[in-house]
Amino acid sequence: MKQYAIQPATLEFNAEGTPVSRDFDDVYFSNDNGLEETRYVFLGGNRLAERFPVHSHPLFIVAESGFGTGLNFLTLWQAFDSFRSAHPQATLQRLHFISFEKFPLTRDDLALAHQHWPELAPWAEQLQAQWPLPLPGCHRLLLDRGRVTLDLWFGDINELTDQLDATLNQTVDAWFLDGFAPAKNPDMWTPNLFNAMARLARPGATLATFTSAGFVRRGLQEAGFTMQKRKGFGRKREMLCGVMEQHLMPTLSAPWFYRSGSEKRETAIIGGGIASALLSLALLRRGWQVTLYCADDQPAQGASGNRQGALYPLLSKHDAAINRFFPTAFTFARRLYDALPVSFDHDWCGVTQLGWDEKSQQKIAQMLSLALPAGLASALNAEEAEQAVGVTTRCGGITYPAGGWLCPEQLTRAVIALATEQGLQTRFRHTLTSLVAQESRWQLRFTSGETASHETVVLANGHQINRFDQTQPLPVYAVGGQVSHIPTTPALSALRQVLCYDGYLTPQNPHNQQHCIGASYHRGDESTVWREEDQRQNRQRLLDCFPDAKWATEVDVSGNSARCGVRCATRDHLPMVGNVPDYHATLTHYADLADNKTSAAPAPVYPGLFMLGALGSRGLCSAPLCAEILAAQMSNEPIPLDAGTLAALNPNRLWVRKLLKGKAVK
């Protein structure tokens, strides 16, 4: 099954050195002067030079059809940098660029194409460094320390625009209608695309395109744009420009999963782990005032406090939402961790998941049938696995070459320290007991008797997320576990990658000459008391999976060194990110949802109350993207995920799925 494969572009370079698509027999940019044409058609056609200084919002959003070589984006980024240098006090502070590409270039072809424009090299090199793997869906790239956001949507634009979340409606300030010429690629230039452009355009939004084809002009007019012709670039006689002068009212296709944000820019985050830390950074980048309340006397005392944690994507043999979310989350996490200006112990040494018995082999075979890019995951036979991991296991599996391990405790503390430098206020030894809605604010009450008032609140406090009246009905559960710390030996030190089986074993951390092996799993148990039986079982699972491996017998847990923590999980293994749903209102308002879908109102939620939780055992993989999703939602900005996958992360999903089928919610 090839549902997760994206076909890269096949191209050649002509005599002028211009890339030409073999699939469409068309150039990616003009042989004459592609850079100047971009400036004239797209920047000039949208009047960006005159609009930037008077833009009344901190963010300007541009959407594009056909990313190609990225010439339009790089040219715009260069112009935006010049604007920011000339107008440092302007309201407009950040640029958000959304682009769709069916056949993305390889990184090597991208670099070759960029050689055409030496003046764009400072921006092109940053793009090349973060160029994503050819996975379907949205890839968010945070560039220029977060001042520029690039959302690359890989896939067919006419399919992708139908999958966009409703929060993107009426957000785009300018459209770059680009791509191969209509005569070369008629499948793209459709009424469906023109209608999607109109749906996403805010009132007053503009568009520009190089073509003057009559059917394009008429299609855009019918969609709602006011169109006019303009002199074309160079030898081209005409081009088209447009303005969205209407105020369209798009309908919500799935109001029960609708996400609402806040016009306010002040929040309290409850928690102290990696999710809280990364969310703080994401909100601060958007200009929020953030106060972090942590029950402990320092960060990373809960599930984020381990010495080594594996980073690799969760894949499923049958769950499409898991297979859409986790590969994207993993690649985003790697980009974010690499870009963070903080230090923490880590090694992107790779992760190999082994098929040690028939059941695990079948599971891995089904995962490999997803046809994921080799840069994300690929098959290994027994011999290849031994070469990759450095120890003998006598079984093959699946390897994640970009995975590895990191120290969650160090990462969490470093990120919170960085956020504090950027304005984060921290309040340690503050255990929240209740939340009380007071007009348009939330009052927080703590065990000390102290209270605080905030415009919005985010619950990101791990397995304690359902301790409040508003969250008590959430279908989440605690999972206690113990990770053992073992000394390295000459045989164990040969391990080069994180090894996953019916447990996991990390390579040694050179800073302490120890490995981590784990982890036990006790559903419903919130105890953090060390257990001798867990220590023994962590070792025994390794021996049971690899009974002939002599190196495995050197695992020594007798030192009784371990760390106990509690995860927060869900039945479907996906996080919960978004508005905190109002359980009783949901059941009341949606009692007849199965029979009245067309008249359903937006999902009942607690205004200004959000959550980021249920990260399970994959928080290091999912927390970065979840934090970015929630920060974007709270800020009413584009969310980097399709509507279907976002629905699978909605905290109300398990209730709504039953209500949609007319089943009782228990």
UniProtKB/Swiss-Prot annotation:
Endoplasmic reticulum is among the record's keywords: no
Annotated GO biological process: methylation; tRNA wobble uridine modification
InterPro entries in the cross-refs: FAD-dep_OxRdtase, FAD/NAD-bd_sf, MnmC-like_methylTransf, SAM-dependent_MTases_sf, tRNA_MAMT_biosynth_bifunc_MnmC, tRNA_MNMC2, tRNA_S-uridine_synth_MnmC_C
Subcellular compartments: Cytoplasm
A Pfam family: DAO
Intrachain S-S bonds: none
FAD-dependent cmnm(5)s(2)U34 oxidoreductase, as annotated region: 270-666
Keywords: Cytoplasm, FAD, Flavoprotein, Methyltransferase, Multifunctional enzyme, Oxidoreductase, S-adenosyl-L-methionine, Transferase, tRNA processing
Protein family: In the N-terminal section; belongs to the methyltransferase superfamily. tRNA (mnm(5)s(2)U34)-methyltransferase family. In the C-terminal section; belongs to the DAO family.
Name of this chain's protein: tRNA 5-methylaminomethyl-2-thiouridine biosynthesis bifunctional protein MnmC
Source organism of this protein record: Salmonella typhimurium (strain LT2 / SGSC1412 / ATCC 700720)
